[in-house]
Amino acid sequence: MGIKVYKPTTNGRRNMTSLDFAEITTSTPEKSLLVALKSKAGRNNNGRITVRHQGGGHKRFYRLVDFKRNKDGVEAIVKTIEYDPNRSANIALVHYTDGVKAYIIAPKGLEVGQRIVSGPEADIKVGNALPLANIPVGTVVHNIELKPGRGGELVRAAGASAQVLGQEGKYVLVRLQSGEVRMILGTCRATVGTVGNEQHGLVNLGKAGRSRWKGIRPTVRGSVMNPNDHPHGGGEGKAPVGRKAPSTPWGKPALGLKTRNKKAKSDKLIVRRRNQK
């Protein structure tokens, strides 16, 4: 999918870019796979803001995407490649030979009319899903499970990919997009290929209104707030932070503080950390 560059006919159009949606084959989703999605605007059940900078935006329907890929041995034909407003990747509508319809994350190179299948005996072909233990070393994969049968949880964003590095007993070594090398059970499934729509991160929204269409509200710097709103607030004019280190609106250390649980049980499965040289 290419990038479309606009002429600076207005201030909002200057530097604006968008995807050309050349891969999208239909604008009408499969009705049986849609679910109503109520906007929460970052609020919890008490109506309090628990996630800032969310609210507004265009109304969406949630597309039921099959992350499990557990219909073994049943072939499916790719019918459409569609836009999904709920994720950065595109999705593909597939029709199984037994009549079932499903959405999957559309990998790079997947085309309408292509046949895909899942299961331990599946070929190493883009769009096919199989256990990690059955995938050769060096293969690029996405939509990786962390627990067998729970569905893919890792490597689902546009342009993301991971690589199978080897096998150690019942575990398979996988290098993730971040550079982290992790051991994952060989019975966990993954889909062959890279997630499509890899140009997604290069889009320049161009104007504030386009962020609002996506349901993203403005992010205000703490230094321009009042002291009762943020620890960085107050002072005369453009005042510095005034503290030993930057902090969150709730006074906790920000920018660089490690937030991972030091007793996380999954530590033993991480062979190489993402920031390790």
From Swiss-Prot:
Q: Which GO terms describe its cellular component?
A: large ribosomal subunit
Q: Which UniProt keywords apply?
A: Ribonucleoprotein, Ribosomal protein, RNA-binding, rRNA-binding
Classify the source by domain of life: Bacteria
Region listing for Disordered, in residue ranges: 219-277
Task: Give the InterPro entries listed for this entry.
Answer: NA-bd_OB-fold, Rib_uL2_dom2, Ribosomal_uL2, Ribosomal_uL2_bac/org-type, Ribosomal_uL2_C, Ribosomal_uL2_CS, Ribosomal_uL2_dom3, Ribosomal_uL2_RNA-bd_dom
* Pfam family for this entry, one: Ribosomal_L2_C
Give the GO biological process terms: cytoplasmic translation
GO terms (molecular function) for this protein are: rRNA binding; structural constituent of ribosome; transferase activity
Q: Which family does it belong to?
A: Belongs to the universal ribosomal protein uL2 family.
For this protein, the record's PANTHER family field holds: LARGE RIBOSOMAL SUBUNIT PROTEIN UL2M, RIBOSOMAL PROTEIN L2
Q: What subunit structure does UniProt give?
A: Part of the 50S ribosomal subunit. Forms a bridge to the 30S subunit in the 70S ribosome.
Q: What does this protein do?
A: One of the primary rRNA binding proteins. Required for association of the 30S and 50S subunits to form the 70S ribosome, for tRNA binding and peptide bond formation. It has been suggested to have peptidyltransferase activity; this is somewhat controversial. Makes several contacts with the 16S rRNA in the 70S ribosome.
Protein name as it appears in the record: Large ribosomal subunit protein uL2
**Species annotation:** Streptococcus suis (strain 05ZYH33)
Q: Which gene encodes it?
A: rplB
